[in-house]
């Protein structure tokens, strides 16, 4: 399960050491950690990272299959998490050390900056290959955080991007060696910790007002 640590002005949220799928308990744990970051006050920034082969493998399809009647509530909770990260009044940096697929890839896009391992691991939106159309909020998030060309290719082809290719496409900001992923993310976050506060939160809310409205208000479909 996710754990939260603090290194001076930088909170580090480790999403876990498994596939880190979006199980309801996992979502609740991440949301509780974000509550702590939000309420902390003072200079601060957030890094999200993970341990092992996966950053996040996306939706918990096994749980969803067993709880089909909760489909809409589940989808709404996933979109609410994206909106929470996107609008958090601190600078957020994600350290993608392993595979980021589907909702895991979208979670990375909700952060302000992204660092990815250069030599192994893929960033991928496989929805087109698994017959799960993007709901409006998720589509809006991807299109707001990527260039039109990158969003078009990622969404329509399901391409698997390695770190170097992801950096070239603007999906991530930096691709670095395995042992530098988390440290680089912390370095970026620490340099921007002084920006935390209401002004930053207002800028984000206005910059992404349409995306946030779609994530919070769209009827979940998948």
Predicted regions and their residues:
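Conserved CoA-thioester-binding segment of acyl-CoA-metabolizing enzymes
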Residues: 1-49
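Amphipathic alpha-helical segments at domain termini/boundaries
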Residues: 1-16, 154-194, 202-222
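Catalytic-core regions built around general acid/base machinery
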Residues: 33-36, 77-89
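Hydrophobic/aromatic residues within transmembrane alpha-helices
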Residues: 48, 107-108, 166, 185
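Glycine- (often His-adjacent) and acidic-residue-rich active-site loop
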Residues: 49-81
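Short, well-ordered beta-strand core segments
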Residues: 92, 114-115, 175
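Glycine-rich beta-to-alpha transition loops that act as phosphate-gripper elements at the mouths
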Residues: 95-101, 154-159
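CoA-thioester-processing core
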Residues: 101-154
């Amino acid at each position: 399960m996710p754990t939260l640590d603090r290194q001076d002005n930088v909170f580090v949220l480790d999403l876990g050491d498994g596939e880190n799928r979006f199980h309801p308990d996992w979502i609740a744990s991440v949301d509780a950690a974000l509550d702590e970051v939000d309420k902390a006050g003072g200079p601060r920034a957030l890094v999200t990272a993970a341990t092992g082969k996966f950053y996040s493998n996306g939706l918990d399809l096994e749980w969803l299959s067993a709880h089909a009647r909760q489909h809409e509530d589940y989808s709404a909770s996933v979109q609410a998490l994206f909106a929470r990260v996107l609008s958090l009044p601190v600078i957020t940096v994600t350290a993608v050390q392993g595979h980021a697929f589907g909702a895991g890839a979208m979670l990375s896009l909700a952060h302000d900056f992204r660092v990815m391992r250069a030599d192994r691991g893929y960033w991928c939106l496989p929805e087109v290959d698994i017959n799960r159309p993007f709901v409006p909020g998720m589509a809006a998030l991807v299109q707001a955080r990527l260039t039109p060309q990158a969003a078009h290719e990622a969404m329509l082809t399901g391409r698997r991007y390695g770190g170097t290719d992801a950096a070239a496409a603007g999906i991530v900001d930096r691709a670095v060696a395995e042992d530098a992923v988390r440290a680089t993310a912390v370095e970026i976050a620490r340099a921007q910790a002084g920006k935390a506060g209401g002004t930053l939160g207002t800028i984000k809310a206005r910059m992404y007002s349409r995306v946030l409205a779609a994530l919070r208000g769209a009827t979940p479909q998948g």
